Amino acid sequence: MQSWSDTALPSVPGQGPPLRLYDTADRQVRPVTPGKKATMYVCGITPYDATHLGHAATYLTFDLVNRIWRDAGHDVHYVQNVTDVDDPLFERANRDGEDWIVLGIRETALFREDMEALRVLPPKDYIGAVESVNEVVELVEKFVASGAAYIVDDAEFPDVYFRADATEQFGYESGYDRATMEKFFAERGGDPDRVGKRNPLDALVWRAERPGEPSWPSPFGPGRPGWHIECAAIALNRIGSGFDVQGGGSDLIFPHHEFSAAHAESATGDRRFARHYVHTGMIGLDGEKMSKSRGNLVFVSKLRGEGVDPAAIRLGLLSGHYRQDRAWTDQVLEDAQSRLKVWREAAALDSAPSATDTVARLRQHLADDLDTPKALDALDGWARRAIEGGGSDTQAPGEFADAVDALLGISLR
């Protein structure tokens, strides 16, 4: 699947401290220690409703990780999937009387446009679930052969399920107890009451063909992949096991990320799918959770269509800490627009105070679990001093603009 256009990053003098991120599995902030090549997998959209601000906030978070790694000289191998075969996609297509393939193609194209407008660096591998069906089939075959998965006794719909107890470490990523797992499993796409399952938490890895649904051939009959196994297969076949960062929204911790890790660990025998599990908070609107069911989603494309500068959208989403649930309001956008105006005014000056210390503080705050509120405050301080007329460094405005571009993804020129 085609990604979107890359952009060259300005070179910024100096070097920041090593990146530290909160690890969901370890419940603490700890160093991220990639080698020369840094590897990251971030779960992509299901293309039927793109791109709302919750999506955007997640991809902006991991764009910062990508930029920090590049700034440190790493070669970044970033992989992102598109869940272009899944129940919500079919449901939306049926509701609107539209072909699910056409819907998926259109929404994926819109997502790419939004990401490019927001200046999100593209993944090296941008892979649709449809493209990876053969990889999923290979994994499911392995699971069935090893006993990690089984076919339910159902002559009409012989689905294949992965045993929740197939790995002894299952549950380490979320840290949830059984009751919490069962609650989220039922709420987030699971089927605990499916007749024939051995354990309510067993996860679907191959859905037998149903009328009106797409299907692909397999040794266990025609059907399509389950959700969690798609990410396991895509990641394993591109960056392998033990990659540096797996990312996504906090609503993916369980069951999606817990099971994708369990699938991969069962296949490889490794104890840990990713070295770091990183999750972003949810975005609300005016004090309410932003969700499809509430009908209060705010879309990047709608804001762009209203003439809002994508840099202001980006800056507004970066104004809160990535791990916090936070609200999007008119005031957040207005504050971002005002901040952007001040920064651009400062970057256009002929001279200003030295920006060296400010750039160092920007790097320091971003390296400390992506502390964007402190990073933005540091930049605000320099911009105010510059506009007030202090400083005679003719290189400083350009250095400031380059650092904001390279590290935050915001163009001031």
Swiss-Prot record:
InterPro entries: Cys-tRNA/MSH_ligase (IPR024909), Mycothiol_ligase_MshC (IPR017812), Rossmann-like_a/b/a_fold (IPR014729), tRNA-synt_1_cat_dom (IPR032678). It catalyses: 1D-myo-inositol 2-amino-2-deoxy-alpha-D-glucopyranoside + L-cysteine + ATP = 1D-myo-inositol 2-(L-cysteinylamino)-2-deoxy-alpha-D-glucopyranoside + AMP + diphosphate + H(+). CDD domains: Anticodon_Ia_Cys_like, CysRS_core. Residues 1-21 are annotated as: Disordered. It comes from the Bacteria. One of its GO terms (biological process) is mycothiol biosynthetic process. L-cysteinyl-5'-AMP binds at residues 43-46, 58, 81-83, 227, 249-251, 283. Zn(2+) binds at residues 43, 231, 256. A motif ('ERGGDP' region) lies at residues 187-192. Its cofactor is Zn(2+). Its EC number is 6.3.1.13. Catalyzes the ATP-dependent condensation of GlcN-Ins and L-cysteine to form L-Cys-GlcN-Ins. Belongs to the class-I aminoacyl-tRNA synthetase family. MshC subfamily. This is L-cysteine:1D-myo-inositol 2-amino-2-deoxy-alpha-D-glucopyranoside ligase. It comes from Rhodococcus erythropolis (strain PR4 / NBRC 100887).
